[in-house]
Amino acid sequence: MRMVRLTLAKFFCALLLSLVASTTLFGQAQKYQGKPVLIIQFEPKDQPLDASELHAILPLKQGQPLRVADVRASIERLFATGRYTDIQVDAEPYTEGATQGVIVRFLTKNAWFIGSVTDAGSINNPPRAGQLENASRLELGQPFNDQKIQDAVGAQKRLLDSNGLFLGKVTPSFTYNDSFQQIDIRFEVDSGLRARFSQPVLQGDVKLDPNIILKATKFRRWLIHTWKPMTQSRVSEALDSVRSLYQRENRLEARVSLESMKYDAQTNSALPTLQIDAGPRILVNTIGAKISKGQLQHYVPIFEEHSVDDDLLLEGAHNLRDYLQSQGYFDAEVAYKPQRVVNDQATIDFIVNTGPRHKLAAIEISGNHYFNTDAIRERMYLQKASLLQFPHGRYSESLLRRDRDAIVNLYQSNGFLAVKVNSRTQENYRGKPEDLAVFLEIQEGPQSFVNTLDVEGIEHLDMKKVLGSLSSVQGQPFSEFSVAVDRDTILAQYFDKGFANATFEWNSQPSPRPNRVDLHYIIHEGQQEFVRKVLVSGLKYTRPELVNRNLTLNSGDPLSPTQITDTQRKLYDLGVFSRVDQAIQNPDGDMPDKYVLYQLDEARRYSVAFGVGAELGRIGGCNDCLDAATGAAGFYPRVSMDVARNNLWGLAHTISLRTQFSTLEQRALLNYSWPRFEDNDKLTLSFTGLFDNSKDIRTYNYTRLEGAVQLSQRLSRDITLLYRLAYRRVSVSDLKVTPFLVNILSQPDHVGIGSINLVQDRRDDPLDPHRGVYNTVDLGLAEHFFGSQRDFTRVLVRNASYYPVGRKMVLARSTEIGNISVFHYFGIPADALPLPERFFGGGDSHRGFPEYQAGPRDGLTGFPLGGDALFFNQTELRFPLIGDSIGGVLFHDMGNIYSSFDHFSFRVHQDNLQDFNYMVHAIGFGIRYKTPVGPLRVDLAYSINPPYFNGFNGTTEQLINAGPVPCPAPAGAPYQCNVQNVSHFQYFFSIGQTF
């Protein structure tokens, strides 16, 4: 008997040898050749595959004659599963009753696969634990071996060294999971003390004062001149800073690199050695046109690449030509002339011939029949001249080539395989020497169609469903683009069903019918793979059931990449994991069932955020400004601090405290959020407590205490319902109103209100919408049943819609209607609703008013009192203004706050100084500047018919002593009235569109 040992590293060599002489591998087994195999055994008994799976994949079968070829094929098949690193085959005679045969034993050594990889211990940041884990390059689910661990330890040690932690130690430890052949790796890190920089050594052709270079490195602290601790980022910033230093000296080819970093253990210091080759000074000039240095640095790539060669200079010449053409110099020519180095200086001249300045006055398109002209223009970069956005148009030869290619691709993707697009330019267009026209002539040619489509190879999917998703079907235009779309569509369906190795081939041939093509698709499905089990690791505080509820994969499901990624997204959406890694264990193994792995890193459970800001503008309600009922301009600093405890109870619940302090308002909001309430992904329950103290913002100062519970239900992708029950107590003070109203309006307000809010959002971009609708309906009921002292209903409806106008403009409109109806009240109707519950408006809702300044006012002081009804309508025409980043807005706002819905009116004239129930109109112009967080908004509004009212010209004491005497004040009164009005001009500044 002879034992054969195969290791994975020698597997392919063993196969090659087996082809030469099978007796070399199984020489002793020859004497058992042909004898029946009575028993097949595996040692150890616990195998990574079930007994049924093992016997199913083995060519060697029990009861059949022993053949060396079957043994060899069995070894190959076992290795192909990827589950083994070592296999030994042993055979010995065995007698069972009267039958003499052999026992074949497979002695196996299991493979191991990488599970979780964590770094812990004494880690001095930087680097962070996550950076060390990434440096190890140990990928989840990949085969494990000792060499990978050695490489990982070395890589982490190098990362520590690069951050000055030269004494750091990395020690790996392992946890084995025999059931899943998975090994979790933990690196215990002891960072040690961080080294500090020391005086750097400068080598090479420096050409600058070493002290200036040392200052540029910033290795040493300013003023106190002590050396900073070494980190990788500081080294990188130092090299960049030194390079910038040479750049400022016009030494564009300067080379700065870190030659070495020597560690001195006695002083715990790091000695950097910088290799510097300054190179000559290089001056870049333009001859024939004046181009700023900034433009040269932007368009000539030698400044970015820190190198000078003919390719970069030629690219710079082309870029400068395109820039000049975009400025209207359509005939511009640019060439470069490099000079030799003389006295440590080289000059590069770009010779520019701008030619006359033109304006792209027309773009004429002809020959198009299949597509209309507007559809073609939408795909073009060329733009006719417009007054502000493109004063000379947008034109260059490269843009013209790009547009021709875009039109060709458009036609070819719709079956016009022989399409041609010719272009020509015409100067002196319509007799104007400065005008230029571009003419595009399209020769469409014949359109090709699919005559027949034959699909071969679909066995495991629904043929009808697959064919229904294709675009290249009988009678449709034929193009390679459509075939590519079909390929992606078919393979996506196969991948989603676990056919990871599915392939797609196609061919075509002309049909006997003219301009018709017969298509033939060939699909090779390959082996379907399934989920053996989903393994989740990394949970410390999070409950497993929370994760399990969000798994879209289960054992036995097809191994779908779509579902794997969808689960990853859902786990991220929980908001409790900073990192979710997903992988397939043993991805290259030839097995139909595979483990899906998710390695989770829990985010920090506590988070703290600080903010600093300010408000600048006209704020209403100034205590010391009784003669300025529309407010006073000022600067109001603001700070905020938010503290949150995430993943409470391990269930993704969150409790947070958000605070804001300013000279105008002090605010604290305590919120408890329970997402996926009752295991429903569409429900979120939240509890809120609010303290809000405000002054100098409205007619009154107030202190608000509120508790609320809210249930959010997502009905569909764009519709959400909010059910809310709130109880609040609001006390007001420092009212700037007629004295006899103070006692009535300053009573503490206790309101319990239940409300339902429906939100429908179908906008294409919530930050800057161009199409779609946004609707909200808010219905509220305050009643004694909810603990409310006042009974009323509240309705607030808003509808906003957005319509593209042509290619560039957007027409946006928003209408808001609200009404509050009081019931079970037997006093004076005007005083039935407390001030804090009334509607206040202005500012963003109507730009003809400052914030909170719309609606009824006090007859003595002129300060706003709010109302029971509102109507606001805003219309904007948004259009590009300058280039692609700056847009303009023309707007019209109309509406007002009304004392009651019965007094709603569209009239535009104010009857008297006590009449505020009329429609105020405002027009204006705004600018929008695109930023990553939304457009920066500046609006200037002109109110056409602002309200006039009686104002109070006196002190607070005079107001208190005034009594119920109305304006105009009689002779000898302790105060004087003066007629005021809301200013015709208002301005607003914020981030985001108005609506």
Kindly give the residue locations of the regions a language model identified.
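Repeated loop/turn-to-beta-strand initiation elements of outer-membrane beta-barrel proteins
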Residues: S578, Y606-V608, L648-I655, F677-L685, ...
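Transmembrane beta-strand segments that form the barrel wall of outer-membrane beta-barrel proteins
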Residues: A91, L551, I584, V608-L616, ...
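Bacterial N-terminal signal peptides
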Residues: K10-S22
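Periplasmic polypeptide-binding modules associated with outer-membrane biogenesis and secretion
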Residues: V4, Q28-L626, Y636-D642, S656-W674, ...
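C-terminal outer-membrane beta-barrel translocator/porin domains of Gram-negative envelope proteins
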Residues: D573, G589, Y595-V596, S607, ...
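Transmembrane beta-barrel wall of Gram-negative outer-membrane proteins
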Residues: L664-P748
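Residue-level signature of outer-membrane beta-barrel architecture
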Residues: R645-N647, W674-R676, F691, Q713, ...
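Bacterial N-terminal signal peptides that target proteins for export
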Residues: M1-C13
